């Protein structure tokens, strides 16, 4: 048994190619760490938060509206992640990333993903005004669901999911190009599997609640509630449906200040 564990550990720490040596320059190592931290961990977590935690567990919705915890986590988390990714880009700026076909694809797709991340940040900045209930004025691009807001939501949501998905491919190519140790491949694969499982579970539970309802409630007369939600797999509830689905088993209801 001891010999098996020893052999398995040796196998784990060998490069993917099976070579007995694994030497990469410092800038390659730090580039990889920055990109895995950003695109492999922080940005996917930000997507999960924005999709499934607009109404947090225990929140007494619709009596308590516009819970900004998800918004702050998404904004600050994605901002930090993008800065880390840009540091990773600077580490390889002007350097030879390799001439093989996988290295070339890694470079091209990497620039596409980086550009998508910057575009996401710019689109968030240009999303338009919000409107009540916590703003000074009830009217706003979001409250009224103006054409500008509809365009922003379609662009931001679609590009966000595509960018994170493409980043998985780019990270996998980076591991191949760097001939990374096998444990890195397995660790990243397990992490992505865990993220996918949590995503599927929360989606099945109906936790992807419409942003408009999370902020303004289920009143069917409101502008955003008179149209279909933008995006796929988004749930809407009235007060009774929400209470039955999410609050029935709670012995204590938490009001979000």
Residue ranges and their predicted role:
Residues 2-257:
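Membrane-embedded alpha-helical bundles that constitute the cytochrome b-like, heme-associated redox core
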């Amino acid at each position: 048994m001891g010999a098996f564990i020893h052999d398995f550990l040796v196998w784990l720490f060998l490069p993917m190619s099976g070579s007995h040596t694994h030497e990469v320059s410092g800038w390659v190592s730090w580039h990889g760490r920055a990109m895995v931290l950003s695109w492999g961990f922080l940005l996917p977590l930000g997507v999960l938060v924005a999709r499934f935690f607009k109404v947090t567990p225990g929140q007494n919705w619709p009596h308590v509206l516009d819970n900004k915890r998800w918004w702050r986590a998404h904004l600050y988390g994605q901002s930090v992640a993008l800065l880390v990714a840009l540091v990773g880009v600077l580490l390889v700026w002007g350097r030879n990333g390799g001439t093989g076909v996988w290295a070339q694809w890694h470079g091209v797709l990497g620039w596409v993903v980086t550009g998508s991340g910057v575009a996401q940040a710019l689109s968030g900045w240009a999303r338009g005004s919000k409107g009540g209930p916590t703003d000074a004025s009830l009217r706003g691009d979001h409250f009224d669901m103006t054409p500008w807001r509809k365009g922003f939501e379609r662009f931001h949501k679609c590009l966000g999911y595509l960018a994170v998905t493409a980043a998985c491919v780019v990270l996998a190519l980076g591991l191949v190009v760097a001939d990374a140790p096998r444990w890195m491949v397995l660790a990243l694969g397990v992490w992505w599997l865990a993220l996918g499982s949590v995503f599927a579970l929360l989606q099945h539970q109906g936790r992807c609640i419409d942003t408009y309802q999370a902020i303004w409630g289920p009143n069917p007369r409101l502008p955003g509630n008179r149209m279909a939600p933008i995006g796929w797999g988004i749930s809407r509830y009235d007060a009774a449906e929400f209470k039955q689905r999410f609050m029935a088993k709670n012995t204590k209801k938490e009001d979000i200040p």
